[in-house]
Amino acid sequence: MASMAAASASKTAPSKATHVPFPSALNKSNKLLAESAAAAAPRTTWTREEIANIYNTPLLDLIYHSSTVHRRFHDPSEVQLCTLLSIKTGGCSEDCKYCAQSSRYDTGTKAEKIVQVDEVIEAAREAKANGSTRFCMGAAWRDMKGRKSNLRKISQMVKEVNEMGLESCVTLGMVDAEQMKQLKDAGLTAYNHNVDTSREFYPSVITTRSYDDRLQTIENVRDSGVKVCSGGILGLGETPDDHVGFLYTLATMPSHPESVPINRLVPIKGTPLGAEQEKIQIPFDAVLRTAATARIVMPSTIIRLAAGRYTMKETDQAMCFMAGVNAIFTGKKMLTTMCNGWDEDKELLRKWGLKPMKSFERTVKQPELEL
């Protein structure tokens, strides 16, 4: 859950994300990009080498092809506006090195009880009034074991949000098949459970929950019929190869996630990564390159700029939209971190000729090759 809280703020380190490929690698990536741009449907048989070749394409070529794919599979003027509310803050037993809500670190975040349904309804109404069409609810705990009363309360929250005409999403840690059935019966639209980073780098960030634990939860969500929302965090100290590995995990699932949030680490004082990464900001080209590659290898998926977007210049955000990003988080806060406000984002969309995506009405094209 805390995976949604992420992003950087300080001096920018020299970019490690890009390099100039050898001519043979360029030829291979050009052929792969051309084939991907002409694809009629998503594929789940990507190799890690293929994704690496796409990721390492010269950046402007990469954006050109990702924009082409985006326009073939989506209405490029539509951007989904999502709002995230913390319904249970702090006190999490996990040791995620980036998270303000871990009980293992002194971050100033106090453990709180789950909020009342009425508070959620009020926040959802405000989000809808400001143009948001997906309302997300996050709880800071490891899993849903022994939380039957909380699950009933959250199911009621989901029902109330749905009745407003909003899409509903929750992020509650690990869930089993029976818990997912209850959420599905309540009408849940999507469940967020991030993989965070590559399988190889993951143990450097989290030790209390395995990578396979995360994949099992995602499988439980997928099997329930609820849409999968799963993404990661950039700026944890990983390498470009870990960006490739993170995308490889998502792009080779039995079916692609319905949405992929891309977070930019927000270093939190008191966390291990707050100290390590405070002076090192993941370069923007790495964020853009990851988003563009995600669009190409998961063409029908919603690609969402999540935590840390407030650190990006307006023109950088516009480049992300051009590259295939078609969702953002907006509102007062993202769990415990800053968030771009509704008024600011309405003006952003107006200025760049974009419009909010309607609830339950996402435009997914049946692509035809455009010459």
Tell me what each language-model feature is.
Residues 79-84, 135-137, 168-170, 191-193, ...:
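Hydrophobic faces of well-ordered beta-strands that scaffold small-molecule active sites
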Residues 103-252:
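Conserved Radical SAM active-site core
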Residues 74, 92, 146-147, 243, ...:
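Alpha-helix N-cap/helix-start motif
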Residues 2-59, 63-76, 251-371:
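Auxiliary Fe-S-binding modules of radical SAM enzymes
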Residues 60, 80-82, 86-88, 93, ...:
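Generic, ordered loop/turn and secondary-structure boundary motif
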Residues 41-119, 123-125, 129-134, 365:
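N-terminal [4Fe-4S]-dependent radical SAM core
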Residues 77-85, 93, 97-103, 155-162, ...:
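Mobile, glycine- and charge-enriched loop segments
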Residues 84-87, 142, 170-172, 234-236, ...:
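Conserved short loop/turn motifs at secondary-structure junctions
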